Amino acid sequence: MDGGQPVPSPLVPLGNGSDYSMSLEQKTTFVFVILLFIFLGILIVRCFRILLDPYRSMPTSTWADGLEGLEKGQFDHALA
């Protein structure tokens, strides 16, 4: 096609590979993406733990705590 010469690519540095170093913006972006992947992993693990055992994360109080002074079993009179 073009005489057998390689086509330059923006992803592959030309010349020696040891001359290529990441810029500050690329390093910052790389660290930010890694932190996002770590955060995503933590959220995935937390969601799977909630799906496997949903009642473990609930408080131990009962529904009757909100009746304010009424004993358990007397809710029929409170509704009337």
Curated annotation (Swiss-Prot):
Membrane topology: Single-pass membrane protein
Localisation: Membrane
Protein name from the UniProt record: Cortexin-3
Transmembrane regions listed in the UniProt entry: 28-48
Presence of the UniProt keyword Membrane in the record: yes
Entries under InterPro entries matching the protein: Cortexin (IPR020066)
Top-rank lineage group of the source organism: Eukaryota
